[in-house]
């Protein structure tokens, strides 16, 4: 008889090194086949039957997302929902499904294509929570790296799916937060400084020499540095793109202020990120590159605003790592 395992994240008081454990509830599949998601014997959907607090998300909606991901697109080992929706260390500032999907082999689809798949399968108009912030990582990477991002997801996250062949285990010991803090702080100090220096050079080129080409190029490059800094401080690894449009799409839910600064609402018509991308491509080599000073000034001001937002975000995250290191 096929069975389902429903996972519930509960406090564990008997082991100080393992604050969480997974409670397994075995349910006869014949008694639970009214939900289409439960048709697959490999799926384990978190329906937490014993959670007293009000949920911040709809389990049926989470199950629908998992079903879409596993319906011929991916063969994951497991999928975790982490962050504030499950009462864990906050990740996204916006209300979003922070999901970590771990796969054994590099999949055909990357996170950008997967967002499109989910948009087709679970349209925004049908979602109670609009945003899905999905990370796709290989099992080999997860098993060979210790970062705060991976620790928070695995220690606090809710297991939405686990393959029949994989035995999911939570970390028994915390990572070395002192090392994580030092590493993130070094990256923050190095690349934030470079970003700020580029902003100063951009302002000098704009105000003093009236060189719009250099002002545009330096502003765009500064934004790339700031986004790389933000990604590393939160995730403990380098981001694999220098495209400011892609970088914002990857990190936008980390701060609603960033979303307000750069998201195009089709009312305000905020095109700063595509313009920054074009600055990077055209200002170094395009002989006909030109931009009106008034328009460039608007884009530069948004970059300065984003720099302050990112610096504040990184500062708060670094404080968290430092506080956790002092408790060890």
Regions found by a protein language model. Name each.
Residues 7, 20-24:
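Aromatic (phenylalanine/tyrosine) cluster motif
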Residues 23-75, 86-92, 108-218, 223-328:
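Catalytic core of pol beta-like nucleotidyltransferases
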Residues 77-81:
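Short, hydrophobic-rich beta-strand element in sensory/regulatory alpha-beta domains
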Residues 93-99:
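Short acidic, glycine/proline-enriched helix-loop-strand junctions
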Residues 101-105:
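Short beta-strand-to-loop capping motifs
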